[in-house]
């Protein structure tokens, strides 16, 4: 599952996950632009 909230505009602070990571707690997904907390939302 990819980060749906911001599509390809997602990055993960955990290096092992890379960009457009799965929405995993270990990946700490955030949006590069816009509301960071919406990266892993289902909207």
From Swiss-Prot:
Record keyword Zinc present: yes
Domains as described in the record? All cysteine residues are arranged in C-X-C groups. These are thought to be the metal-binding sites in other metallothioneins.
One Pfam family assigned to this protein is: Metallothio_5
One of the GO biological process terms: response to metal ion
Question: What lineage does UniProt assign to this protein's organism?
Answer: Eukaryota, Metazoa, Ecdysozoa, Arthropoda, Hexapoda
Q: What is this protein called?
A: Metallothionein-2
What organism, scientifically named, is this protein from? Drosophila melanogaster
InterPro entries for this protein: Metalthion_5
Annotated gene:
MtnB
Q: Does the keyword Membrane apply?
A: no
- What is the role of the protein in this entry? This protein binds cations of several transition elements. Thought to be involved in metal ion homeostasis.
From what superkingdom does this record's organism come?
Eukaryota
The family this protein is said to belong to: Belongs to the metallothionein superfamily. Type 5 family.
Alphabetically list the UniProt keywords: Cadmium, Copper, Metal-binding, Zinc
GO terms, molecular function: copper ion binding; metal ion binding
TM region positions: none
The induction text for this entry reads: Strongly induced by cadmium, copper and mercury.
